[in-house]
Amino acid sequence: MQNIYLISEKEAKKLLKELADKIERYNHAYYIENNHLVSDAEYDQLFNTNLKLEQKFPHLILENSPSKKVGAKIANKFAKVTHQAPMLSLSNVFDEQDVKDFVDRIKNFLRLNEFAPIFCEPKIDGLSFSAIYKNGLLTIGATRGDGYIGEDMTANIKTIKNFPHKINNAPEFLEVRGEIYIEKQDFFNLNKEQEEQGRDKFANPRNAAAGSLRQLDSSVTAKRPLKYFVYSGGATEQNIASSQNELLKKLKEFGFRVNEISKLADSEEEIFAFYEYLKTNRENLSYEIDGVVYKLNDFALQNRMGFIARAPRFATAHKFPAIVGQTKLLSITVQVGRTGTLTPVAELEPIEIGGVTVSRATLHNFQEIIRKDVRIRDYVFLQRAGDVIPQIIGVDIGKRSTDATTFNTPLFCPSCNSKLHYIPEDIIIRCDNVLNCPAQNYERIRHFVSKNAMDIEGLGRKQVEFLIDKGLISNPLDIFLLKEKNEASLTKLENMDGWGRKSVENLFKNIEESRNVSLPRFIYALGIRHIGEQNAKLLAREFESYNNFISQIELLSKNDSNIYQKLNNLEGIGDKILVDIINFFDVKENIELIKKLGEVLNIEDYKETKEHSSLTGKIVVFTGSLPTTSRVEAKAMAEKLGAKVAVSVSSNTDLVIAGVDAGSKLKKAKELGIKIIDEEEWLTIVNNV
């Protein structure tokens, strides 16, 4: 990444936009899908780069800046819960100087002459929750969500062993906040059970805890070994205590589990000593921690310090450095993904890092192998920092043997033997044999049945692989014909290895239930490159119904310029994504598959809660800087009133709202004779509606 102190304003503007998009994607994966896309260290580096750029160019801060947000927007499976007080994130520090700066900021802000006691406690690597008690009874349990609105998990939280359903001598209203987690040994046992049952293994204990809690069926959660600690009283903590250490004593009296490993530090030296103690002993703990949390102990002083957009000023998290180990690289295998992208994976001599046995590590892409000069039979340095797959960060050249061999970048697909396509701008190699590559087909079906797509439980990796190998399915449509095919077959599925009557009955039941699917989930399930859940929702909002969707994409496949322009105007669908959409529907087999799926599924029309107004169905464009309203707020207003917000002006545009320094869009609107108004007129329309 460029030196931010030498970066120009133009470059900074572009980079801030890229960082906001990237961090939003990682946040959604982490908080909603319970999935790490990047290491904690890489995420922190991106976030800190964003902060430093904003400090240098404060006038470039975006409305959707990561520094203003916590978590990610919640999914639609669970009821929404508005938090009494925001569940904010914590800022991070990484070394002693950062900690000293944190302490100095407290002193300077409060104008203190001496050290203010700091409460230190382990940072549990789990899932944050809030629990509300009214008259001593647990009434609401919720996840953090986006920090302001979480998901109602009351029934599931009640299944956690020893979680109080009723507390004595409690105030009329009480909130507690904490972390739900799974211990290391329980995680190992759970993954062993998942593997034996042919289900996907969890990537790490946090992922397992989050996935276990976010179950629609609370009986599934009840079977998972979830534990919890509380560390905060949320909106009510200052009603029952005057400091953090006093609060934890009180919560313990109420019957909650609090972490006994903590320290009230009276000096910087005591802070550093506690940090070193935990860093040294973390592997001896039964649960995962990834740092130490420091909080100003006195609540009155906390009140004076207050908050910034996404975090309190009075607290921070001192992250541990990534755990590094060394082992031998035995070979490099190549995986082919759903969209044909090839990824190199290092096969390693097993090594234990941070209590987890590691035998594989990502090499990201083939350029990385060349850049790091990684060779087969090298001794490599391995880093694990909460990653789904640990990373190779370097090679011990001093240990390189004469039989270490260079890895040759493949020219042909390891699955179908097709010639590969190198895409320099994306630093990727891709197999373009979309229809006949077995690996791509397998990954496409896996994506189709996944939780956020068709959500067909009972079709894990092993089951999909088995059904493909036996010739029982070869595409998503076959899944819905499987029961009929099984009934007509002499060799029943329930009599095959790994199956039984009950598991087959459950599978067919789950397949049947999945036939009712929303349009956004259906579009996402198709596996179009670069169409994640958010973009699938954008397309569903545009097409509104399955019938309209299929008719429009058929026109798009015939190069209809109106459909192209309509999609190109959608905010969030750029040129690159539009090319991927066109490429997908250029394949006639894809359109035929979608038509056949439409015959066996009940695809629900897209419905979005919006007010009916004179703007309903109108296409509006904002251009220039609005004097009193942010672009994000203006867009939200328009969409709430039923309008569609486009990013460019065309003959389909109904209204242009022009602000200060409006440029080419305003000019084009005048040329096309489109109605143009200023912000004042726009707000009048909104207020009248």
Swiss-Prot record:
Binding, Zn(2+): 413, 416, 431, 437
Domain BRCT: from-to ranges: 610-689
UniProt keyword Magnesium present: yes
Catalysed reactions, as listed in the record: NAD(+) + (deoxyribonucleotide)n-3'-hydroxyl + 5'-phospho-(deoxyribonucleotide)m = (deoxyribonucleotide)n+m + AMP + beta-nicotinamide D-nucleotide
Residues binding NAD(+), per UniProt: 40-44, 89-90, 121, 144, 179, 295, 319
Family: Belongs to the NAD-dependent DNA ligase family. LigA subfamily.
Protein name from the UniProt record: DNA ligase
Organism whose genome encodes this protein: Rickettsia canadensis (strain McKiel)
High-level lineage: Bacteria, Pseudomonadati, Pseudomonadota, Alphaproteobacteria, Rickettsiales
